[in-house]
Amino acid sequence: MDNQWFQLGYLISAGLFIFGLKMLGHPRTAPRGNQLGAMGMLMAVLTVLLETDLVTRPVLIIAGIALGAAIGSLLAIRVEMTGMPELVALFNGFGGAASALVALAEIYSAIESDTIPKGLELHVAWTAIGLSALVGWMTLTGSLVAFAKLKGGFMILGKWRRTPTWGPSWLNGVKGLIMLSSIVVIYLSVTTPDDFQMVWVLILLACLLGVVLVLPIGGADMPVVVSLLNSLSGIAAAFTGFIISNPCLLYTSPSPRD
């Protein structure tokens, strides 16, 4: 199939996303906006499947779609309207994790197949992968903490535990140190691109950063935090779109979605 048709598919999906987001701004048009967003996602998925020739593996594709649809439907049906902020926090985390997993798969594939790029391409690709991993895993753990705070607590060994709000002044220094360490690890991964251990170190730092960023914030401010995490999830997806050369992710990911 001609590449022009794939670009047209991405353009149509991006248009549906944009119009859907605009309609989400008013309660009367929000249901229609949600439908347009779903149609845009369907168009994007179909375009990717056709462009990458993944339709030759129908069992894997159908299984993934069925599993994702089942989990999403179950969560959306069971959660009351008052629990929507918690659900949005979870979806933000899942979106960030998806972007981070794609980055992880890309770097693993390049190392295993010995197709690591050279020169400027290496610096650009590995930096984008590192930033996608950093923002994605940070969004996941931060969203999980936000979910626990909105819910008020969680069950541990059959006992209800309240989510703590803990943030001494010295924790700000720890946040800065973790962020600086993450940047150093990304730099080291560029200088030693075949060292997969750097990836695990970056994942650990990013997960820890997400926790310490959200932990000091009280439950009353969680909607603001969820909105910020939503934006970070979009940024992680944009980095991923750059990594895999997917224009649809670049068009729509940075857009605010709530």
Regions found by a protein language model. Give the residues of each.
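Structural signature of hydrophobic alpha-helical transmembrane segments
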Residues: 2-14, 55-68, 129-137, 195-204
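Transmembrane helix-loop junctions at the membrane interface of multipass transporters and ion channels
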Residues: 107-116, 233-250
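N-terminal transmembrane signal-anchor/hairpin module of polytopic inner-membrane proteins
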Residues: 1-58
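Cytoplasmic-side transmembrane-helix entry/capping segments in multi-pass membrane proteins
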Residues: 31-39, 84-95, 168-174, 224-229
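Transmembrane alpha-helix boundary signature
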Residues: 48-62, 74-83, 102-117
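C-terminal ends of transmembrane helices
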Residues: 17-29, 70-87, 143-160, 209-219
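Alpha-helical transmembrane segments in multi-pass membrane proteins
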Residues: 40-44, 60, 64, 68, ...
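Conserved small/polar residues in nucleotide/adenosyl-binding loops
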Residues: 251-258
